[in-house]
Amino acid sequence: MALAKAASINDDIHDLTMRAFRCYVLDLVEQYEGGHPGSAMGMVAMGIALWKYTMKYSTNDPTWFNRDRFVLSNGHVCLFQYLFQHLSGLKSMTEKQLKSYHSSDYHSKCPGHPEIENEAVEVTTGPLGQGISNSVGLAIASKNLGALYNKPGYEVVNNTTYCIVGDACLQEGPALESISFAGHLGLDNLVVIYDNNQVCCDGSVDIANTEDISAKFRACNWNVIEVEDGARDVATIVKALELAGAEKNRPTLINVRTIIGTDSAFQNHCAAHGSALGEEGIRELKIKYGFNPSQKFHFPQEVYDFFSDIPAKGDEYVSNWNKLVSSYVKEFPELGAEFQSRVKGELPKNWKSLLPNNLPNEDTATRTSARAMVRALAKDVPNVIAGSADLSVSVNLPWPGSKYFENPQLATQCGLAGDYSGRYVEFGIREHCMCAIANGLAAFNKGTFLPITSSFYMFYLYAAPALRMAALQELKAIHIATHDSIGAGEDGPTHQPIAQSALWRAMPNFYYMRPGDASEVRGLFEKAVELPLSTLFSLSRHEVPQYPGKSSIELAKRGGYVFEDAKDADIQLIGAGSELEQAVKTARILRSRGLKVRILSFPCQRLFDEQSVGYRRSVLQRGKVPTVVIEAYVAYGWERYATAGYTMNTFGKSLPVEDVYEYFGFNPSEISKKIEGYVRAVKANPDLLYEFIDLTEKPKHDQNHL
């Protein structure tokens, strides 16, 4: 049932603002004949309710720590956000900047989707469903900080996250995962506002979706409020937002019925989604609204006056909060100092000393070594918030004394309990939203949180769009991906991620790390914490040898290094990750046959690429020595470093780990034969050094054997 219409407030100025706003949107889209006008025109009443009456923010200090967060999940409607930033007094959002929308201006602050680099934009949105998932992360961040640091009379963190979604967002997988999870957690500091215009790119929404959205949210433990005339009724939307703010124990959906392209010739038509109306259509609407049809890009002074009190109000918010924090620090010196460090985005100064240096000498899976790093760091570093997609039993990240971030009212059948002060999250089987939520945590305030996720490596493919968005936004998280390569063994090809390495190695602003033993795990984990960007660790389930005195904590941080040297080498072997073992054993056989063999360990291509030219040349010796990479992944990407590869060129197989390596020819005896032949071929024809040779044959085992 819809919320009863609220008593009118400021109807005349609301109406003037909405009319002028719609015309301004149309002018901006028309100037370069491109953009998304329709939803921005239909959502103006929502914007007035949020920016004028509800949200707590500062236009003079857009990064104020305790501000309410606003996320436009339907990012194509960015003109809506830019225009309200302009009206509310954000200094960087000038009329000139507004006019740069869809222009050729390299320095435009009005890109086609909101981007985190620009002021007052919390997260980059565009791929639908990401923004609402990020919003859950932002809400978790606030809940966690409040539970850890708030004291009676000192609510130093009490902000709300507001997120606008459209019909399309609510059809995307990560959104559905996040809606379910937010309801489960009872995040009452999250308010999602649904721009329900029932129109999509291809027509009306019912061509593909006829579900009851409100019923779905209620089933997911959301408080649901419905507003009938969302295109015009500012007062009722304000009332709905007030009710959302009063709700305890549940997030709120405000289902606002709007009209795409309101009052224009393409009202309620899919053409309003992403097309310019045309000069004649704009002229007709301006005349209908009582405006001068020849006047473009114009807000009446009364509209600016209506929003003019917002900067001063924001200054007051910031001043009062600073005074509160100052008193808080005096009242709680130790906790206050920690809180101030979190606000600055600082890790404890001693964090490196927390990482274990007593590394194993016996065969150990790299996932086990990584687990030791995470546990040691998380135990005493409050910035760390870690979790898994229902694989905690396998990845085993919870540290001694860890508390679960959980709805405090939840009583689980298995006895697991927690509250909002916990820092270990059970995400359920929701890999995509797990990583998108990690982005929200990272974006809350850079450095305040260090999100660490974990799952089987194969399942990070479900989360690829979220990891790409982390890279795009330069957000920092660490992802612990276990059961890599064909080492997942009996689980078979569905769980053996033989092709994913190429994706992550190619991703800009992203570090893919595949350590070969515990020393490399130690060095690379330290490096990952230092880096400002996201990292994915590719880790073995099976045990691998340790190489004290050969593998190097410090050299691993350089991405690639000389593991075993040889003067005037006949062949170089690159070992990566768990296949470093194959390189070492193959080298022994080749040496026994009279070849001089150099071994390179290569756990991270991007780190290696960042080294000096001199260092890279000293390690690789390109053009001088034939170089074979040995890795149980596809070869794509290794052409830049090696001249040949013993790699995977087919999907995996369900066999015990030793047998699956044998099945695909990953045994030193077989590899050494291929490499020996390759060395002879290169000596006979040196031109082979200048093309990449695949030394792997597809398995020829009898498929008909019963």
Curated annotation (Swiss-Prot):
Catalytic activity field: D-xylulose 5-phosphate + formaldehyde = dihydroxyacetone + D-glyceraldehyde 3-phosphate
GO CC aspect terms: cytosol; nucleus; peroxisome
Swiss-Prot/TrEMBL cofactor(s): Mg(2+); Ca(2+); Mn(2+); Co(2+)
Compartments, record wording: Peroxisome
Binding site for Mg(2+): D167, N197, V199
Function per UniProt: Involved in assimilation of formaldehyde.
UniProt motif (Microbody targeting signal) ranges: 704-706
GO-annotated biological processes: methanol metabolic process; pentose-phosphate shunt
A molecular-function term among this protein's GO annotations: formaldehyde transketolase activity
Keywords assigned: Magnesium, Metal-binding, Methanol utilization, Peroxisome, Thiamine pyrophosphate, Transferase
Protein name: Dihydroxyacetone synthase
Alphabetical list of Pfam families matching this protein: Transket_pyr, Transketolase_C_1, Transketolase_N
PANTHER family: TRANSKETOLASE, TRANSKETOLASE-LIKE PYRIMIDINE-BINDING DOMAIN-CONTAINING PROTEIN-RELATED
PROSITE patterns membership: TRANSKETOLASE_1, TRANSKETOLASE_2
Classification via SUPFAM superfamilies: Thiamin diphosphate-binding fold (THDP-binding), TK C-terminal domain-like
Record organism: Candida boidinii
TM region positions: none
Residues at the site labelled Important for catalytic activity: H36, H273
Keyword Transferase: yes
Active-site residues annotated for this sequence: E431 (proton donor)
Record-linked SMART domains: Transket_pyr
Cofactor note: Binds 1 Mg(2+) ion per subunit. Can also utilize other divalent metal cations, such as Ca(2+), Mn(2+) and Co(2+).
Stated family: Belongs to the transketolase family.
Catalytic activity, EC: 2.2.1.3
Binding of thiamine diphosphate, residues: H76, G126, P127, L128, N197, H273, E431, F459
